[in-house]
C-alpha cells in the first residue's frame, strides 16, 4: 500500500517553502509505505506527498499524477492509492470515444 498525504492551506499563499519541506519530511517518514519512489507537488494552497509502491509501469508512472491541456499541464493533480484492474479496457474505450492519448502504461 502506498503512502500519501495532503496539506491544504486556508488562504492563497498559505503554503511556503517551509511547509513544502515539512510535508517532504513527513513523506520521508512514510517511505516504508511506498519504497519505490517519493514525490511531492505544491502550489500556493496545497501540498501533496506520495510514496509509491510500484505495481504497474514501474519505471514511468510517477505520482502525483498531473494532467491538463498543453498550456496548463498541471491543471489537475492527483495522488492515488489503488489499482484499476480493467484499465486496458477503459483506455481503449477512452481512445475510441474521445481520441484520448496516453503517455505511459500507468499514465502517470
Q: How would you label these PLM feature ranges?
A:
Residues 1-108:
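N-terminus-centric sequence/structural signature that marks the extreme N-terminus
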